[in-house]
Amino acid sequence: RSILEEAGCQIVRVTVPNRDAARALEKIKQSTKMPVVADIHFNHVMALHAVDAGADKIRINPGNIGKKERVEEILEKVQSRNLPIRIGVNAGSLEKDLLKKHGYPTAEAMVESAERHIAICREHHFDDIVVSLKASDTPLMIQAYRLFAEKYDYPLHLGVTEAGPYKQGSIKSAIGIGTLISEGIGDTIRVSLTDDPVQEVKVGFEILKSLNLATRGATIVACPTCGRLEDDLF
C-alpha cells in the first residue's frame, strides 16, 4: 500500500501532461487499489492515452481543454470504457468569453462554464459526470457550489484550490469544504495544500471528523485554559 493509502486516501488524482506521464500512470495503476483520476489540461489527446493506461476517471478543465470537438473525442473514448468525467471548473482559468461577459470570475460565470460542458455531454447521451467549481477565494467557491447545487443533482467534488501553505490552506479548506458539507452539498473532497499530500489527507479527515462524518484517529478534547484552571498548564 502507498503512503497515501496508509493515511486514508480513497481516491488520487495525477496529472497527465505528456506520454511519459501516461506511461507512469499505467505503473501507478498496477501498484494501487485506489481509483486514479487523470488530470488533463490543454492537450486532449493525453486524455485518450490516460484511458488506455487504465485511468478510472478523466478530469478536464473547461477553461483550457479547447474546442467542442476535443471534448467529443474524450467522450467517445470514456464511453467505450464506461468511465466518468469530472468537469473541473477553476475560477483562475475561465473561458475568455465568460470573463468578458461577467467582468471577472463570478459564481455565475463558473456555473455557466460547467453548464456548457454538461450540454456537450448530454448531446452525446453521456451523464456519468462529476462537477467541481474551485476557487482560491473561499466565499466565491462556496457561492459557486451553492448556485450549482440549486440547479443540478450531479455529484460534486469540493475543494478550495491554491489554498496555500499548511496553516492558511487548512483554515480556508475547513471553512469552504466544511460549510458546504454541513449544508448537504458535496460528495468527495480534496484539501489543497502547498505541503506533503499526506497532510492534505489528514486535514481532510479532520474536517469530516468535525462534522461527525468520519471516525479515523482520536479526537482530542483539550483545555484552552480558563478561570477554573488551578495549575500552570504551560
Predicted features along the sequence, with ranges:
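Catalytic alpha/beta core domains of metabolic enzymes, predominantly
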Residues: N90, L98-F234
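Glycine-enriched alpha-helix->loop->beta-strand junction motifs that scaffold or abut catalytic
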Residues: G8, T32-M34, D52-I58, Q79-N82, ...
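Hydrophobic or amphipathic alpha-helical targeting/insertion segments
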Residues: M34, V45-R86
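N-terminal active-site wall of soluble small-molecule enzyme domains
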Residues: R1-I3, V12-A53, F234
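Alpha-helix-loop-beta-strand connector modules within alpha/beta enzyme cores
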Residues: N18-I40, E73-I85, Y145-L156
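Catalytic beta/alpha-barrel core
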Residues: I11-N18, P35-F42, D56-G66, M110, ...
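Conserved radical SAM core fold
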Residues: M46, N64-I65, A91-L99
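Generic structural signal for hydrophobic
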Residues: I3-E6, I28, A50, I74-V78, ...
